[in-house]
């Protein structure tokens, strides 16, 4: 059924969507000209958000005196929150507090188009961008005429990240350590040898497989070296004179992985007699088959139906179920939107292929059934609202995962792997920008006064400075959501953004219940807690720690040790009202402050964690089956999107966007380089768009980096799109490689066709698939639930 925007109201539509549908193009309105251009941002990456602030400040400094200044408003809730906020403002025709630009996905353009509020960038020069990455503008419904409505300023794709040490243990166990011999451990702790009936074979006659196996072996050797170093440290503590092997031993890594993964079992339908080839990672069908076989081979996976946070989570982790289903179904349909769930042509969306159970419906059933075997073996981990696979993979709890290339900075553990562990065995990585909360002082040690019974605790912040360590500010969007990761954790993460510079730059913040006493100022040097649950937990922790301290102290010392009763952070952790609570900000902080209670700090050995050099980064599967003719790669990321305001503001909006894309200016080098020499230089000349992508693991789709056949070599020495973070970032390297192939038509780019209903379609298929993973539902139950969530609007 083809649906023309502005003519039909579907009974199942969300309230806001129904209002917009009723208005149609007649809903267009002018905003009040307030003499400024407002950019709405839902960025949760601190690096990207800080870069955007720097860009706006720069524009306001260099613009002509008569040009309108730019200001940023932050919208909570990520891109979904931004979309919802925009829909609300459209529905009430907000003329006074709307915005001119928004960073979001192209379906927002469709929402705007239904009421005539889209703004074409017809005055913006986009000739620097590769046209392949502007093609999505042809697949946006509800716009009145073809044009450029969204400009990709931060592209990413997905990669398949292999955990080298874990995969080595799986394969080595299945093929036997020597010939057909498998070494296992008895309940008494002694080793015993077991003969494998049909060991796994690694097809090293295939050059790709041989190369991949070498990479896997090297990763295990590196992890084995860490295990040996840990042993050496323990021996040194015991005053042993033994030395360790600096070369690294893969068998040492296998022993360490085995502690958590358990013994390999040779079973029918598992890895017994299987031939391993690198090509299994090229397509979804073979990847899921291999994953299912591996899951069947380990009891700690297949027999664990109720996984705790510290358990092995499975073989394969998937961060976006919708992405995986969409790309596999698109690939199964020969990379053709005519064979996809829906398509957009001539400004109209057509869902008939799915609705009429056409090829996309049949392909979805095939894909789902491939997943079903892995689901039944408890071998699939899916992200259910914040628990990203990188959190588990970096602690060797997954064999491999499919993740966004924008997530490089939080995908690996630091030199000191720390996490905050809750009583139920769930955990979050020790967030950056975190300081401990100390119990009220009882002996006048300078931390606080103890005369006020309402004082719950104190924490210390250093003076916040403009420039922060770039490598520690990137990609915070996925941090700390209970069993979720944080980038570069463990690298002295204790402290606020610039803690520990000088003692005399620090400020002690006091936490109170009931009321803040005279002489203290809320939001400056004091916080008032109103949540009774949080108050009780802080008080109980102080009492418990105080009692333990008195028992331990005895006659050893008259100086009381500082008692930690919780932690506070501005990292992007999600409050749950149980252990993580939102509290007031200090000194107008840009990010929400949280208090975390009921946790203990856990430090893991390095051999229990995944380092970046131990990961093998591959493209996410580009085909559904190996016989498919076309290879598919997803392109994703927010676009800069214009919103109609009035004639003057529309012109000023386009002027800013054109400057953002095309005008080279001097930027402070220390803001966008991790190279120490670069940080000593005063400036670096580039466009604002180039400066922005360097803030995180993003790609700007410039023609010059795709059209040059020797792109990698030339770009590494070029001032264009050169980012020290990108060149050392294996995820971005893989993204550049894939995007170059897209620009040459060697592979097909997939992005969601943009319609006002596409967000609901995506959310529906993802949430129902995740529910099917939990319930182990079959395809009929899954698709029935999915269709029910769509209602009558599709």
From Swiss-Prot:
Residue numbers with lipid attached (S-diacylglycerol cysteine): 23
Membrane topology reported for the UniProt record: Lipid-anchor
Polar residues: bias regions: 177-196, 238-250
Keyword entries, A-Z: Cell membrane, Lipoprotein, Membrane, Palmitate, Signal
Subcellular location field: Cell membrane
Positions where lipid (N-palmitoyl cysteine) attaches: 23
One Gene Ontology term, aspect cellular component: plasma membrane
InterPro entries: Lipoprotein_10_C (IPR004890), Mycoplasma_lipoprotein_cen_dom (IPR004984), P68-like (IPR054825)
PROSITE patterns referenced in this protein's UniProt entry, alphabetically: PROKAR_LIPOPROTEIN
Pfam families membership: Lipoprotein_10, Lipoprotein_X
Annotated region (Disordered), positions in chain: 177-208, 220-257, 466-506
Ranges of Low complexity composition bias in the record: 220-231
Signal peptide start and end residues: 1-22
Family the entry assigns: Belongs to the MG185/MG260 family.
Protein name: Uncharacterized lipoprotein MPN_284
Species this chain originates from: Mycoplasma pneumoniae (strain ATCC 29342 / M129 / Subtype 1) (Mycoplasmoides pneumoniae)
